[in-house]
Swiss-Prot record:
Performs an essential function in the repair of oxidatively damaged mtDNA that is required for the maintenance of the mitochondrial genome. Binds to DNA. It comes from Candida albicans (strain SC5314 / ATCC MYA-2876). GO terms for molecular function: DNA binding; single-stranded DNA binding. Residues 34-77 are annotated as: Disordered. One of its GO terms (cellular component) is mitochondrial nucleoid. Transmembrane segments: none annotated. It is found in: Mitochondrion matrix, Mitochondrion nucleoid. Keywords: DNA damage, DNA repair, DNA-binding, Mitochondrion, Mitochondrion nucleoid, Transit peptide. Residues 1-18 form a transit peptide. This is Mitochondrial genome maintenance protein MGM101. GO terms for biological process: interstrand cross-link repair; mitochondrial genome maintenance; recombinational repair. Belongs to the MGM101 family. Residues 38-64 have a biased composition (Low complexity). It comes from the Eukaryota.
C-alpha cells in the first residue's frame, strides 16, 4: 500500500478522504444488507421500524405481511375437518333435589345387585338357531329386533332404554358414539357403537341409527343375550350345520371370491352371481 504522507499529501486531506469513504461504505452496507423484520410484530415494534427505516433513498415498496394478503376466492379450499352434529347429551338440572340422574356421566346402579331369577332366565335363554344370520365374510349376528324383543320380555316395554353418553364422532367414512344401557333405573352396560357410511353427509342419519344398533348389541352381550355368538365351538358347529361357502363372480369386474351363505338361501344378491 502506498504511504500517502511520503508522497506529499497533507494530513488534512487524508483524514477527509478516510472519513468520507467510511460514511459512503456505511450507507452502501445499510442499503445492501438490511433485512426485513419478521412477519408477526407487535404494534410498537412495527411503528418504530417504520419511522426508522423511512428515508428518501429507499425506493422499494413496503412488503405486505402474510396476514394482510387475502386468499383468492377462486382457489377452492379442501376441508379436512369432520362433520359436527352438535348432539352432545344435555346436562340434567338439579331442581329436583338430586332425583334426576345425568346418564351422560353417571354410573348409578352399575353392579349394585343382580336382577331377579325370572329376568335372568329370559336374558340367559339359549338363542334360537334359526334366528341367527351370517354375513358374506362369515361373521354371525343376530338382527337388532331380536335383542329388543328379549329386553322387552325381560324388563317390559318402557323398562329399559339406551342413553347416549358422548357426542357423535364423525369422520369421512365412519360414525361412532358411546351409549349406556339402563334397565329398571340402573346402568347395566356401556358400549361404543360404530357404523361405516358411504355417500357423503346425507347418509349420516341412517349411519347414526346403525351406530345405535351396534351399541345395543354390544351392551346386550354383558347381559348374556345371545352369548353363543362369541363361542368359537358354537360358531363352528352352527356353520357346519346351516351354512356353506361358495365361489361367486362379480357381474361387472368378473372377479371371483368365496363367500358364506345359508343353505336355505338358493339365490345370490347383486352384484354377485354363482359360478
Amino acid at each position: 500500500m502506498f504511504n500517502l504522507i511520503r508522497l506529499g499529501f497533507p494530513r488534512t486531506s487524508i483524514i477527509r478522504y478516510y472519513s468520507s469513504t467510511a460514511v459512503n461504505q456505511a450507507k452502501v452496507y445499510s442499503r445492501t444488507y438490511k433485512r426485513a423484520g419478521p412477519v408477526t410484530k407487535s404494534s410498537t415494534s412495527t411503528s418504530r421500524s417504520t419511522s426508522t427505516d423511512a428515508s428518501p433513498a429507499s425506493s422499494s415498496p413496503p412488503k405486505e405481511s402474510v396476514s394482510d394478503i387475502e386468499p383468492s376466492s377462486e382457489v377452492p379450499v379442501k376441508s379436512t375437518t369432520s362433520y359436527i352434529l352438535h348432539d352432545a347429551p344435555l346436562e340434567a338440572s338439579n331442581k329436583n333435589n338430586g332425583e334426576t340422574i345425568n346418564w351422560s356421566d353417571s354410573f348409578h346402579g352399575l353392579g349394585a345387585q343382580p336382577f331377579s331369577k325370572e329376568i335372568a332366565e329370559i336374558l340367559l335363554a339359549p338363542v334360537a338357531e334359526e334366528d341367527i344370520e351370517i354375513k358374506p365374510d362369515g361373521l354371525l349376528y343376530l338382527p337388532e329386533i331380536k335383542y329388543r324383543r328379549v329386553l322387552n320380555r325381560a324388563f317390559g316395554p318402557g323398562g329399559w332404554g339406551l342413553a347416549p353418553r358422548t357426542e357423535s364422532l364423525v369422520t369421512s367414512g365412519q360414525i361412532s358414539r358411546e351409549y349406556g344401557l339402563i334397565c329398571h333405573g340402573r346402568l347395566v352396560s356401556i358400549a361404543r357403537g360404530e357404523q361405516d357410511y358411504f355417500g357423503g353427509e346425507e347418509k349420516l342419519t341412517t349411519a347414526l341409527e346403525g351406530c345405535k344398533s351396534n351399541a345395543l348389541m354390544r351392551c346386550c352381550k354383558d347381559l348374556g343375550i345371545a352369548s353363543e355368538l362369541w363361542d368359537p365351538s358354537f360358531i363352528r358347529r352352527w356353520k357346519k350345520k346351516y351354512c356353506e361357502e361358495i365361489f361367486v363372480e362379480h357381474v361387472n369386474t368378473k372377479k371371483k371370491k368365496k363367500i358364506w351363505k345359508l343353505k336355505s338361501i338358493k339365490t345370490i344378491d347383486y352384484p354377485y352371481k354363482m359360478t
